[in-house]
Amino acid sequence: VKYKIGNGVMLIQPSASKDRTLQTSEPSPAGHALKADDLLPESLHQFLACETPKAWLQWALENPATLLIDHAQCEKKAASTAMSLLYRYVDQPLLLSKMSQLAREELLHFEQVVALMEARGVAYQHLTASRYAEGLRRHLRSNDPERLIDVLIIGALIEARSCERFACLIPYLDEELAKFYRTLVKSEGRHFEDYLLLARQQTSDSIDERIAFFVAREAELITSPDTAFRFHSGVPA
């Protein structure tokens, strides 16, 4: 699938002040009618413990280049994670099938974001990672199957949060970028369910308590202060 990029200008909402106290208010919509609420499954809303704070949304609109660069990084990391699981767990046919499909899809999205960046004059540069993924992975247990269960739960949370943030951004972005993000929500909206399915497959015991633990940690990371904007950062410090 190819996307027409247009004139290469990302809409940035004007701000009368850089006072961070203003970031708790709703940014002004971009003027088109595009949304993605109809594409997000209800199960995704129920899975996440909190919505993306308005302060992060305003922060994202103030950092359009970083948003795209880190988005590309996220797609590449998602593909890398899927490939790593493919190599490590060759004895699980369902995991191989799900992760193979996911890796191809994430790499396609990576290519699309990079093409979009090039069309808009955004140079791909190295960004330090946010504390988000590492803040979740620090709780990984050491041995399988417990470790794999944790990895899969974390994968589910990252996928769910990514789609939720795409949907949050859509009304405030220029129309062509909003259309692109809407296609991502449509194609990736249920990836988190695949991760949870695989996690539950690893044991006959309930993993609900472990899921609840990571959901709570994820919400803490999303709502706590960060000094650098990233796609999965918390609120501005």
What do these predicted ranges mean?
Residues 1-6:
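Extreme N-terminal basic, low-complexity initiation segments
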Residues 11-14, 18, 23-237:
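Non-heme di-metal
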